[in-house]
Design a protein with these regions (language model features):
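A short, structured beta-strand/loop element
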Residues: 25-62
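Generic preference for hydrophobic/aromatic residues in regular secondary structure cores
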Residues: 14, 52-56, 75
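Short leucine-rich amphipathic alpha-helices used at interfaces
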Residues: 14, 42-43, 86
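C-terminal structural segments of small proteins and small subunits
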Residues: 61-89
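N-terminal first-folded block
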Residues: 2-35, 39
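Generic detection of intrinsically disordered/low-complexity segments and helix-coil linkers/edges
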Residues: 16-19, 39-41, 59, 77, ...
Length: 89
Protein backbone atom coordinates (compact mmCIF):
# COMPACT_ATOMS: atom_id res chain seq x y z
CA UNK A 1 0.00 0.00 0.00
CA UNK A 2 1.42 3.37 -0.96
CA UNK A 3 2.14 5.87 1.78
CA UNK A 4 0.24 9.11 1.11
CA UNK A 5 2.97 11.21 2.75
CA UNK A 6 5.61 9.76 0.44
CA UNK A 7 3.44 10.33 -2.64
CA UNK A 8 2.73 13.93 -1.64
CA UNK A 9 6.48 14.58 -1.47
CA UNK A 10 7.00 12.90 -4.84
CA UNK A 11 8.64 9.89 -3.23
CA UNK A 12 7.05 6.79 -4.76
CA UNK A 13 6.76 4.03 -2.20
CA UNK A 14 7.49 0.62 -3.68
CA UNK A 15 6.21 -1.31 -0.67
CA UNK A 16 6.06 -1.46 3.10
CA UNK A 17 7.20 -4.39 5.23
CA UNK A 18 7.94 -4.82 8.95
CA UNK A 19 7.15 -1.14 9.59
CA UNK A 20 9.67 0.04 6.99
CA UNK A 21 8.88 2.06 3.87
CA UNK A 22 10.85 1.15 0.72
CA UNK A 23 10.91 4.10 -1.71
CA UNK A 24 12.93 6.34 -3.97
CA UNK A 25 13.03 10.10 -4.50
CA UNK A 26 11.69 11.20 -7.87
CA UNK A 27 14.41 13.81 -8.39
CA UNK A 28 17.31 11.47 -7.67
CA UNK A 29 18.73 9.74 -10.67
CA UNK A 30 21.33 7.07 -11.17
CA UNK A 31 22.69 4.92 -9.89
CA UNK A 32 19.56 2.87 -9.38
CA UNK A 33 18.92 2.69 -5.64
CA UNK A 34 16.24 2.38 -2.98
CA UNK A 35 15.76 4.13 0.35
CA UNK A 36 14.34 2.45 3.44
CA UNK A 37 12.98 4.30 6.47
CA UNK A 38 11.16 3.22 9.61
CA UNK A 39 11.46 2.36 13.28
CA UNK A 40 13.74 5.37 13.78
CA UNK A 41 16.28 4.35 11.17
CA UNK A 42 17.16 4.72 7.52
CA UNK A 43 19.24 2.97 4.88
CA UNK A 44 20.08 3.26 1.22
CA UNK A 45 20.94 0.39 -1.13
CA UNK A 46 22.41 0.79 -4.63
CA UNK A 47 22.16 -1.69 -7.49
CA UNK A 48 25.62 -2.81 -8.63
CA UNK A 49 24.41 -4.77 -11.64
CA UNK A 50 24.08 -8.00 -9.69
CA UNK A 51 22.53 -7.11 -6.34
CA UNK A 52 21.55 -4.23 -4.08
CA UNK A 53 24.40 -3.26 -1.74
CA UNK A 54 24.23 -1.11 1.36
CA UNK A 55 25.65 2.40 0.89
CA UNK A 56 24.16 4.22 3.93
CA UNK A 57 22.73 3.07 7.24
CA UNK A 58 21.73 4.86 10.42
CA UNK A 59 19.75 3.70 13.44
CA UNK A 60 18.70 0.29 12.11
CA UNK A 61 19.10 -2.71 14.39
CA UNK A 62 20.90 -5.78 13.03
CA UNK A 63 17.75 -7.92 13.13
CA UNK A 64 15.79 -5.27 11.19
CA UNK A 65 18.66 -4.88 8.74
CA UNK A 66 18.56 -8.60 7.95
CA UNK A 67 14.80 -8.42 7.29
CA UNK A 68 15.23 -5.34 5.08
CA UNK A 69 18.02 -6.94 3.06
CA UNK A 70 15.94 -10.09 2.57
CA UNK A 71 12.95 -8.05 1.35
CA UNK A 72 15.18 -6.15 -1.09
CA UNK A 73 16.90 -9.30 -2.36
CA UNK A 74 13.61 -11.15 -2.84
CA UNK A 75 12.00 -8.18 -4.61
CA UNK A 76 14.93 -6.83 -6.64
CA UNK A 77 13.07 -7.38 -9.93
CA UNK A 78 10.09 -5.34 -8.70
CA UNK A 79 12.33 -2.52 -7.47
CA UNK A 80 14.21 -2.36 -10.77
CA UNK A 81 10.97 -2.49 -12.78
CA UNK A 82 9.38 0.33 -10.75
CA UNK A 83 12.55 2.45 -11.04
CA UNK A 84 12.64 1.99 -14.82
CA UNK A 85 8.93 2.77 -15.16
CA UNK A 86 9.23 5.90 -13.06
CA UNK A 87 12.30 7.23 -14.85
CA UNK A 88 11.15 6.02 -18.30
CA UNK A 89 14.14 3.76 -18.81
Amino acid sequence: MADKQHNERNMPEIFRFFGFSFFFYSKELEPLHIHVEGNGGMAKFEWNGTEFVLTEKQGIKLNDFRKIKTVIDENADIIIKRWNEHFNK
